[in-house]
């Protein structure tokens, strides 16, 4: 009769030298990968082209754009994209996704800054022109003054004016931060 002691018989999965990953942790990783896949699906084609993806994953994301959201087929397809994401290293994709999304936020912030400049120019007039020319010497004071006067006259007639748009375009083209 053989007595079984501290042998292989009593070993648990976490007793090995390798790092043990529980089912719960594995599920969390899978859900995180699926969420990254959902973020990729929400991107436009131009944004998606900026991210380096596996060809099969890219095609699946393009197919997801063709499926109507809030349908069972869409849900299954999102799970399939999650499955594909599990086989790919997610970290570089997350980093590229953050860069693409942050770039859009930076562009929006710049546009809002130019919008505020235009509003200040239209409300404060020459004093704001002086401040802007001191801060941004590349601006042409005369052109700025002309655009502000035209925009102010046109704004009295209606909310949208051609000169106001020209002023915005001029500020955006001349000021590079």
UniProtKB/Swiss-Prot annotation:
GO terms for molecular function: ribosome binding; rRNA binding. InterPro entries: DarP, DarP_sf. SUPFAM superfamilies: PSPTO4464-like. GO terms for cellular component: cytosol. Its main location: cytoplasm. The keyword S-adenosyl-L-methionine does not apply. Keywords: Cytoplasm, Ribosome biogenesis, RNA-binding, rRNA-binding. It is found in: Cytoplasm. The keyword RNA-binding applies. Gene3D superfamilies: PSPTO4464-like domains. Pfam families: DarP. Disulfide bonds: none annotated. GO terms for biological process: assembly of large subunit precursor of preribosome. Residues 1-26 are annotated as: Disordered. NCBIfam families: PRK05255.1-1 (NF003593). Member of a network of 50S ribosomal subunit biogenesis factors which assembles along the 30S-50S interface, preventing incorrect 23S rRNA structures from forming. Promotes peptidyl transferase center (PTC) maturation. Belongs to the DarP family. This is Dual-action ribosomal maturation protein DarP. It comes from Shewanella sp. (strain ANA-3).
């Amino acid at each position: 009769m053989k007595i079984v002691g501290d042998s292989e018989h009593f070993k648990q999965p976490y007793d090995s030298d390798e790092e043990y990953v529980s089912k719960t942790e594995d599920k969390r990783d899978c859900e995180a990968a699926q969420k990254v896949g959902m973020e990729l699906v929400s991107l436009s084609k131009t944004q998606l082209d900026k991210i380096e993806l596996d060809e099969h994953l890219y095609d699946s994301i393009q197919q997801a754009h063709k499926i109507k959201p809030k349908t069972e087929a869409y849900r299954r397809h999102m799970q399939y994209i999650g499955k594909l994401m599990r086989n790919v290293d997610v970290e570089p994709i997350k980093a590229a996704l953050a860069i693409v999304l942050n770039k859009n936020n930076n562009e929006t912030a710049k546009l809002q800054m130019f919008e505020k400049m235009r509003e200040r120019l239209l409300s404060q007039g020459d004093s704001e022109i002086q401040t802007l020319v001191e801060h941004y010497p590349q601006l042409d004071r005369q052109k700025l003054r002309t655009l502000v006067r035209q925009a102010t006259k046109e704004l009295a007639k209606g909310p949208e004016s051609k000169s106001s748009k020209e002023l915005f375009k001029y500020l955006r083209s001349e000021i590079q931060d």
